[in-house]
């Protein structure tokens, strides 16, 4: 809804979200978080067609893994903050995506969020996750 409001008022914007896995961890149901990707991608495409500059990035498969943070399920916000403070590679990775999100660029790069499915499929292969039920399409 926020993307549609920004588009209506002709306000350029940036989007960052997790791609997530196509299925739930057991692989027996569609992951609703993954299903939203297409809606976001289509809405961003519409905004661009309307002449807006939209920077669109995705964390594959999620923010923590994308930025090489190993976090427990408990205390994630604090542990994330601590990782950024203490681990240079994590801080650098996050700074890079934040700089992309605030930059003005009319070209659409290969890491654009509209390529989320290909990005995830490549990640699955590179990380040998093909046999995990949640990554089955």
Identify the role of each PLM range.
Residues 1-137:
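Acidic, divalent-metal-binding catalytic cores of TOPRIM
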């Amino acid at each position: 809804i926020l993307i549609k409001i920004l588009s209506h008022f002709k306000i350029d914007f940036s989007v960052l979200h997790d791609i997530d896995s196509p299925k739930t961890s057991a692989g027996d149901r569609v992951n609703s978080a993954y299903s939203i990707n297409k809606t976001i991608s289509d809405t961003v495409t519409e905004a661009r067609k309307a002449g807006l500059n939209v920077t669109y990035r995705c964390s594959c498969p999620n923010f923590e893994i994308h930025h090489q943070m190993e976090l427990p399920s408990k205390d994630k916000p604090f542990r994330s903050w601590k990782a950024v403070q203490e681990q240079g590679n994590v801080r650098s990775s996050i700074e890079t995506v934040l700089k992309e999100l605030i930059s003005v660029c009319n070209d659409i790069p290969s890491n654009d969020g509209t390529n989320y499915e290909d990005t995830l499929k490549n990640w699955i292969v590179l990380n040998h996750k093909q046999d995990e039920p949640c990554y089955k399409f």
